[in-house]
Amino acid sequence: MHLKFHTLSLNDSGPLLAESSVKPSQQQICDDILLLWREEPITDGLSVDLLYDKVMGRHPEWILDRTEFKNAVRNQHLDSNDERSLKVYNDFIDIPSFNDDYDAIIDKKTSSNVCVKNCKDGHKGRGLYALKDFVKDDLIFKESYPIVVVPSMERLTLMKMGKACSLCGGLLSHLSKHFIVVHSLDCDNCGGVWCSNECKNIDIGHNTLKHLHKSKINGIDSVAWGKFEKYCNDNVFVAAYSIGVIMALALIDKKNTDKIRKKFNLLSSVSQGIRINESDSTNIGGTFDASSGAMSNKDPEPIWKTSYELLKNAIPTTDELDMETYLSYIGRYNINQISDQMFFLPSLINHNCEPNVRFEVVSNKEIRVYARKNISAGQELLTNYINPLHGVKLRRRELRVNYGFLCHCDRCIKEIKRNNDVENENLSNSINNNGGLSVPNDSLLTRRKSSMRTARPDLSELLKTGQEFDLDIPENLSGKKNRRTSVRFVNQVTLAVEE
């Protein structure tokens, strides 16, 4: 029995308006392919011809012949198995070598079960290793705070209104005004409110950064800082804002200045300019810095320059901060951040598409690292930098664009071989007019789905530890990220029917 997929409109959906014919750019083609791979991971292994049919089924308004489509795919390296043709920038990444500085700043109370040392694979630099055996779901270690706690930029407006914690950004709807006043959780000089005494006590930058002062406090111009913060917020430039907060807190928190700077400088670094040059796509189907509020501007340099000048005005004492150093800080943030925060030890954990650890971030402040499977003493801890549900092409592309390297883990090699085998068998699948995928060869599709189930993490486990995969963040009409994860409701349903 052969099945094919039909896509039908729901009863209560209105008729679709006919769209004018358009000629898509190579960028649009690339973005739609990437979006398709995100929405339907099984299409990751389609041949170029079947991929063309699928994309054209999604965009009947496009004027695009098969040759133009193949050229776009080839130019963007979307179907290339020749690694020599793929751009990577791992050689440009500065990875500080292992030295005694790591041990000196590791909190032995919460991180005594791990150590930092150089990896056997020289390309990976240093890594984090287990000092004892762990069984699945064991807590390996935790970090109570990131290098500095960076307030959630997407909630800055709510913070000013006293509706979200001035430090962690947690919503305050569960706290009564009486409770806030009795426990002195409100600021005497502004509308800021904290969710707990813990957040209030560690928010030592609040007075300097949130209150206007006639003169510089701790070497920081509060008026200029407000302009820098507003510019970053308006342009969804999370990386620049985070770097600014880290630099400011390194000046304000004099007790921990050396520790803050040492932790920051021990993290891997690469210029954001290099990363931009090596990326192929930054629009809705793109993957570049998607987890940290990527800017879709074709020319980000004006935003870099303006934010740099505003930061220099806010912190005039940073004489050593030239434009190239600033861009290296931006790149450092983007390749190390976890949930918009820079945690030290977790940033040292290397990638594998079949990881043995998982993260749990609590209230933007604490991160806990658990064993995903049994781990032996001396074994390297490995995490997944990208969405584990994606197919091998999209996974490797996301790693290449965001982190500068191609993954050669066992899972990737296995899936690449499987895709090549499927393509070599010249599947006779075809795409119907509605964009559905007909499946005349049940055994091949069953084998592909079976191998996908085997290779990917258990879905129940992913749902239990939902920090490890994200809903895509859509863009609004202006092209800027709105930073709010959304669910898209569609007016169509797909079902399988017998031919």
From Swiss-Prot:
<dbReference type="Pfam" id="PF00856">
    <property type="entry name" value="SET"/>
</dbReference>
<dbReference type="GO" id="GO:0032259">
    <property type="term" value="P:methylation"/>
</dbReference>
<dbReference type="GO" id="GO:0042799">
    <property type="term" value="F:histone H4K20 methyltransferase activity"/>
</dbReference>
<dbReference type="InterPro" id="IPR001214">
    <property type="entry name" value="SET_dom"/>
</dbReference>
<keyword id="KW-0963">Cytoplasm</keyword>
<dbReference type="GO" id="GO:0000785">
    <property type="term" value="C:chromatin"/>
</dbReference>
<dbReference type="GO" id="GO:0005737">
    <property type="term" value="C:cytoplasm"/>
</dbReference>
<dbReference type="GO" id="GO:0000723">
    <property type="term" value="P:telomere maintenance"/>
</dbReference>
<dbReference type="GO" id="GO:0005634">
    <property type="term" value="C:nucleus"/>
</dbReference>
<keyword id="KW-0158">Chromosome</keyword>
<comment type="function">
    <text>Histone methyltransferase that monomethylates 'Lys-5', 'Lys-8' and 'Lys-12' of histone H4 (H4K5me1, H4K8me1 and H4K12me1, respectively), thereby controlling gene expression and remodeling chromatin structures.</text>
</comment>
<keyword id="KW-0539">Nucleus</keyword>
<comment type="similarity">
    <text>Belongs to the class V-like SAM-binding methyltransferase superfamily. Histone-lysine methyltransferase family. SET5 subfamily.</text>
</comment>
<dbReference type="InterPro" id="IPR046341">
    <property type="entry name" value="SET_dom_sf"/>
</dbReference>
<dbReference type="GO" id="GO:0045814">
    <property type="term" value="P:negative regulation of gene expression, epigenetic"/>
</dbReference>
<keyword id="KW-0808">Transferase</keyword>
<feature type="domain" description="SET">
    <location>
        <begin position="112"/>
        <end position="386"/>
    </location>
</feature>
<protein>
    <recommendedName>
        <fullName>Histone-lysine N-methyltransferase SET5</fullName>
        <ecNumber>2.1.1.-</ecNumber>
    </recommendedName>
</protein>
<keyword id="KW-0949">S-adenosyl-L-methionine</keyword>
<keyword id="KW-0489">Methyltransferase</keyword>
